[in-house]
């Protein structure tokens, strides 16, 4: 398995630099032909959401759709797909940041009964507790 960095994933999704997109696409195709999916870590996914939102000004709904589509791609593997699915589900209808949704979902998968926070938006999500 081969992991990728955020810039490769962003090029794969956005296609704003055709030569770099082609390099990313060929990498995914080559790995798939070898039966080795590309790994997307939680950190890469989190940074990708940030780049799509802050650099490309994509709407939350568009980012949710793009990240959800990645989950359906058999050529890609994810560090913790179940956590990502829960985080995306919670994020789509909340005012909280994707990072908060990912933190809470990951903590719950690791056995935490809650996640303490001072973030008012995060407190509106199930699983966060105020301190």
Residue ranges and their predicted role:
Residues 104-131:
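Acidic, PIN/NYN-like endoribonuclease modules and their adjacent C-terminal/linker elements
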Residues 5, 41, 96-97, 119-120:
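Histidine- and aromatic-rich ligand-binding microenvironments
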Residues 1-40, 55-62, 68:
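Short, well-structured N-terminal submotif of metal-dependent ribonuclease cores
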Residues 6, 42, 81, 100-101:
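Conserved glycosyltransferase catalytic-site signature
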Residues 42-44, 65-93:
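Acidic catalytic patch
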Residues 44, 83, 102-103, 121-122:
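Alpha-helix capping/helix-boundary segments
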Residues 35-36, 96, 112:
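Short, high-confidence coil segments that cap the C-terminus of an alpha-helix
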């Amino acid at each position: 398995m081969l992991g990728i960095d955020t810039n490769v994933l962003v090029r794969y999704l956005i296609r704003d630099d055709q030569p770099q997109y082609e390099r990313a696409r060929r990498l995914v195709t080559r790995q798939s032909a070898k039966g080795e999916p590309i790994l997307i870590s939680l950190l890469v996914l989190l940074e990708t959401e940030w780049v799509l939102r802050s650099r490309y000004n994509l709407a939350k709904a568009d980012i949710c759709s793009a990240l959800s589509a990645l989950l359906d791609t058999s050529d890609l593997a994810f560090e913790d797909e179940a956590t990502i699915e829960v985080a995306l589900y919670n994020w789509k209808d909340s005012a909280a940041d994707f990072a908060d949704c990912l933190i809470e979902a990951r903590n719950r998968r690791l056995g935490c009964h809650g996640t303490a926070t001072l973030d008012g938006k995060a407190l509106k999500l199930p699983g966060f507790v105020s301190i």
